[in-house]
């Protein structure tokens, strides 16, 4: 765990933000009001902005869970305990510990040119086991196809502190064609502030410049 920590020394304290995994609520009998004020689950999150021939298709997320939480979830879904998720096991895990996140926008907040992107969907969900820990991968479509300048901000957080999320300071751009030049940074975004505007999450900020 802490795969991004060494690259993020000196960053703002808000690099670690809250994410509550309500998709796993079958295993945690709590509500947000009952959650403790310090994290119990830790997630490293990396984002890849994916382009196709039309423009910015969307953002692929990859979450690595801490070993203790992963062991608990895999204990229920990796039925034969072989550290490989079969298609049936992966489907059961999706239904039992992921789909409920739809009710919470998958804890993903996106601003496009300062405006809220409200249609947060998740496709291509793929759980796996890497180096003994649980990994989620999924895709959030955006479909920005015009050739205007755009600024896209993506943050992963929730107003509960049950789970801490460490964002990758070196997120990626994939499949870029000659339509755009891009700049990608991880930085605090004050417009996303929450908890009485006292907490400012870090977001991956992608600037698209038409060529």
Mark where each language-model region is.
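N-terminal secretory signal peptides that target proteins for export/translocation
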Residues: 1-15
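Sec-dependent N-terminal signal peptides
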Residues: 12-24
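N-terminal signal peptide c-region/cleavage motif recognized by signal peptidases
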Residues: 30-32
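Early extracytoplasmic/domain-onset interaction patches
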Residues: 39-64
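Long, contiguous binding/interaction regions
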Residues: 65, 89
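Acidic, glycine-anchored loop motifs typical of Ca2+
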Residues: 76-87
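Short, well-structured hydrophobic secondary-structure segments
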Residues: 85, 91-110
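Mature, soluble, non-transmembrane domains
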Residues: 107, 111-211
């Amino acid at each position: 765990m802490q795969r991004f920590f060494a690259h993020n020394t000196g960053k703002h304290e808000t690099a670690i933000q809250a994410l509550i995994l309500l998709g796993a609520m079958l295993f945690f009998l709590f509500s947000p009001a009952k959650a403790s004020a310090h994290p119990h689950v830790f997630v490293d999150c990396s984002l890849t902005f994916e382009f196709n021939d039309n423009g910015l298709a969307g953002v692929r997320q990859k979450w690595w869970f801490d070993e203790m939480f992963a062991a608990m979830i895999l204990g229920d879904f990796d039925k034969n305990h072989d550290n490989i998720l079969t298609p049936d096991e992966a489907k059961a895990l999706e239904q039992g510990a992921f789909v409920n996140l739809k009710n919470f926008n998958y804890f993903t907040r996106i601003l496009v040119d300062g405006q809220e992107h409200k249609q947060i969907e998740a496709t291509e969900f793929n759980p796996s086991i890497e180096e003994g820990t649980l990994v989620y991968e999924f895709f959030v479509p955006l479909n920005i196809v015009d050739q205007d300048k755009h600024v896209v901000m993506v943050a992963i957080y929730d107003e509960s502190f049950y789970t801490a999320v460490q964002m990758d300071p070196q997120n990626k751009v994939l499949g870029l064609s000659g339509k755009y030049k891009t700049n990608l940074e991880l930085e605090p975004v004050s417009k996303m502030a929450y908890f009485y505007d006292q907490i400012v999450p870090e977001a991956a900020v992608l600037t698209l410049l038409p060529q």
